[in-house]
């Protein structure tokens, strides 16, 4: 089971996101992802994402998170498993998505599914999941979990920040 964390500075907040803030959040869940961890902080330091990794589907470093689309518009930290990710990937390839950095990462499928279909992509997913997806162009954060809530996702506001974790 992976661990995801993040924080978004609320409008008017004077606090900027720091790597140490996200890293501290992330590493409190080291038991949820012993295979590695990473963080991403936006250039303007208004949002940060973190991930503790338990490698299951794609064991390569290319599948590390947080992960971004090639144009870095979308950023994702994700925990779970999309059982039908190969079918969705084939559909995306048929639509012209031909540049993949991983061979079979369901994380990358979520990113490009969101790029193609927006939030409606979740209706295609069969599995258990929780994720945070940042749209850097629209400056929107999506916090999403599976229909039943198998993968937890908690959030709160704290010191002018929306904070969240699995």
Each PLM stretch: what is its role?
Residues 1-166:
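Cysteine-centered catalytic environments shared across enzyme families
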């Amino acid at each position: 089971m992976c661990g995801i964390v993040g924080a978004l500075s609320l409008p008017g907040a004077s606090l900027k996101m720091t790597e140490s803030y996200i890293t501290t959040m992330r590493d409190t869940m080291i038991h949820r992802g012993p295979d590695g961890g990473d963080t991403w902080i936006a250039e303007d330091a208004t949002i940060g994402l973190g991930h503790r990794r338990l490698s299951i589907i794609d064991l390569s470093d290319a599948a590390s998170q947080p992960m971004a689309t090639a144009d870095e518009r979308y950023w994702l930290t994700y925990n779970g498993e999309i059982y039908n990710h190969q079918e969705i990937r084939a559909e995306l390839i048929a639509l012209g998505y031909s540049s993949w950095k991983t061979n079979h990462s369901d994380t990358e499928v979520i990113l490009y599914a969101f790029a193609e279909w927006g939030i409606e992509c979740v209706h295609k997913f069969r599995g258990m999941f929780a994720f945070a997806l940042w749209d850097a162009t629209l400056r929107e954060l999506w916090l999403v979990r599976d229909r039943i809530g198998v993968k937890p996702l908690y959030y709160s506001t704290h010191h002018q920040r929306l904070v969240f974790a699995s």
